[in-house]
Amino acid sequence: MEKLKILVVDDESRMRKLVKDFLVKAGYDVIEAGDGEQAVDTFYAQKDIALIILDVMMPKMDGWQVCREIRQNSKVPIIMLTAKSEERDELLGFDLGVDEY
């Protein structure tokens, strides 16, 4: 059985490593992106991504922009994993189509 592929997007390499290690141990295949622009490029290059775990505050393209771009063409599940914890941020995430915040 083929492993599900998860795209982990965060500009902090330590956070990506922490999430990746947890997911790999759970049996998932993990691809990393260090900024929003790389995330979009990777998503469209890899046609079999099953889930995106996405930070908000990143260089080049923030998580909100990434979500808008991907939601134009895909319903892939997106989980926001971010330090932005205000209610308005969470509401914006759900308005943009994230599945969990």
Language-model regions, residue ranges each:
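Non-catalytic signal-transmission and effector/linker regions of two-component phosphorelay proteins
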Residues: 1-7
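Acidic, metal-coordinating helix/loop segments flanking the phosphotransfer/catalytic sites
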Residues: 7, 32-51
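Charged docking surfaces used in two-component/phosphorelay signaling
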Residues: 17-25
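Acidic catalytic/metal-coordinating carboxylates
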Residues: 35-38, 62-65, 70, 89
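Receiver (REC) domain active-site loop signature in two-component systems and cognate sites
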Residues: 58
